[in-house]
Swiss-Prot record:
Family the UniProt entry places it in: Belongs to the IL-1 family.
Processing after translation: N-terminal truncation leads to a dramatic enhancement of its activity (>1000-fold).
Molecular function GO labels: cytokine activity
Subcellular location: Cytoplasm; Secreted
Gene Ontology terms: biological process: inflammatory response; innate immune response; positive regulation of cytokine production; positive regulation of interleukin-6 production; positive regulation of T cell differentiation
Originating species: Mus musculus
Protein name, UniProt field: Interleukin-36 beta
Length: 183
């Protein structure tokens, strides 16, 4: 069996201070918005779990408690590209953990950072590292990094591998996910 070499890892990093803005009567159009929550799995029924500070994909079962993905639209339209999808922030429900793209050892890497998703939403100018294009392909969703165009969130076809960023779609990795609204 061929091993899947990790292309990047998801690690939890300490929070950075975030400059916030206060909504006024001109900017209240989205201030009461809250994230939507989704259960996520890939075509091989792998779900996302948080093991320590690492996000991995494991086969769905009654013994597994998958994370719930929180998703909220970005109000800053600077990086909007309707061909790629909607601009969103991604986080883990009931955790102050958000998906972030950084460069490590010369390669785009997916990380979890200790940030409240609503703080990202309320910022006047969006931080590009936290932004993803949420695209729809058939009945699946794809999440492409805004900071690293052409790099997508992916799971390995081998269980218990770290969730990564990849630019090699369809080669040993899954970049298309089924998301189901959690009520």
């Amino acid at each position: 069996m061929m091993a899947f070499p990790p292309q990047s890892c998801v690690h939890v990093l300490p929070p950075k201070s975030i400059q916030m803005w206060e909504p006024n009567h001109n900017t209240m159009h989205g201030s009461s918005q809250s994230p939507r929550n989704y259960r996520v799995h890939d075509s091989q029924q792998m779900v996302w779990v948080l093991t320590g500070n690492t996000l991995t994909a494991v086969p769905a079962s009654n013994n597994v408690k998958p994370v719930i993905l929180s998703l909220i639209a970005c109000r800053d339209t600077e990086f909007q590209d309707v061909k790629k999808g909607n601009l969103v922030f991604l986080g883990i429900k009931n955790r102050n953990l958000c998906f972030c793209c950084v460069e490590m050892e010369g390669k785009p890497t997916l990380q979890l950072k200790e940030v409240d998703i609503m703080n990202l939403y309320k910022e006047r100018k969006a931080q590009k590292a936290f932004l993803f294009y949420h695209g729809i392909e058939g009945s699946t969703s794809v999440f492409q990094s805004v900071l690293y165009p052409g790099w997508f969130i992916a799971t390995s076809s081998i269980e218990r591998q770290t969730i990564i960023l990849t630019h090699q779609r369809g080669k040993l990795v899954n970049t298309n996910f089924y998301i189901e609204s959690e009520k």
